[in-house]
Structure formats: structure tokens, C-alpha cells
Amino acid sequence: MNMKLKAYFYYDIISPYVYLFLKSRKILEDKLELIPVPIFFPGLLRLQENTGPAEVPEKRIYTYQFCVWKAQKLNLPFQLPRRHPFASAPAQRILLQNNADLAMLDKAFDFVWGQGHDPELEWEDFCVAIGLSKNTPKPQDEKIKKALIESTQTAAHHGVFGVPSIRIDQQVFWGVDSIDWILEYLNKPEMFSEKEFQIAHSIINPLLEK
């Protein structure tokens, strides 16, 4: 029996795209060992001086409507929370603290994006949904807080700039629509060594020129 290739799956419950990815992952699990890695998406944006979709009004609406459309195409339950973005750090910390596997992530993301709940304001119900006691407190352990920060910094170091992202060796794939690309890469691992792909590294960026 061949061992599956390890693939690191970077996520934050703040993103509806991660929900769509989780629901579409089966075809990847046949070939990859998906290893969940919780990060703090707002922190990742700050590290890279980037702007999230929620900070651009038109992009925010587009994101929500695209996810509604995509979920319908995939025949998935999908409901937007009444407020977004919510503070995702407590949820990410509790998932990290419990070494959340894909089964726990399914429960967490179903609660938020399948049912439209707010994990920040509905903390007790969120904990129950993922199999914990409703009396589970929001993590305050400095080690857990530090671990999430370090996980985010490590993700940035590996070139992760958004969620969901999949890292195979040193190659990062971003977004739910990258699944087909990942599958092609697995069949053709030399893909990024080809001239057509290498050219991307040599394109001059006038915005960075002094």
C-alpha cells in the first residue's frame, strides 16, 4: 500500500471558502494525507500588509454571493451568519487546543457556514457542536495563544497568503477552485519547473521599483 503524500491544510473558520473546500475535499483525500493547520487569517493579512475581502465593501458582497452560488452548484447547505467578520481567534484557539481533525472541522464549519451561526456570540452552542462541553471556556492559555501566532507566522514563511491553502512540499495552492490544479500537479510534479511557469518569477513589478 502506497503512503499518501502529506499536504498541510491551512484554515480559519472566518472563511466561507474553507467550508466549500472541506465539502469538496474527498477527491484529494484519495491521494493526500490532509493535515489541518489552524491559523489566524487577520493576523496573516497584517503580516503581509494585505487587505481582506471584508474590508472592501464591493468585494465583501461579491464573496458572500459567490459562496451562495457555489454552494447551490455543489448542492450544499449554506447560510451566512447575521454578522461577519466575527472574531475567529477563540474558535481557532479551541480547535488548535483540541488538535482538531477533519471530522471536528466538519462539525465546526457546518455550525457556522452550513447553519449560519456565530461562534463568537454563540460560544456554548459552538462548543457543543464540535463535541465539547457547553461550559468550555474560551482559551486563555498563553501557550495556546502563542501557538496560533506561531502557526500563522510559519504559514506566512511558507508563502501562504489566504485560506484555504494547501501546501505540498513547498508548493502552495490557494482557494477552493485550486483542487483541479492540485490533482494535475500530483500527476505532473515537475509542472512548476517548466519554462511557462518559471516566467512568473521574472516578471518586473513596477510598483516595487524605486
Q: Model regions: which residues?
A:
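Structural alpha/beta surface segment adjacent to cysteine/selenocysteine redox centers
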Residues: 13, 17-112, 196-210
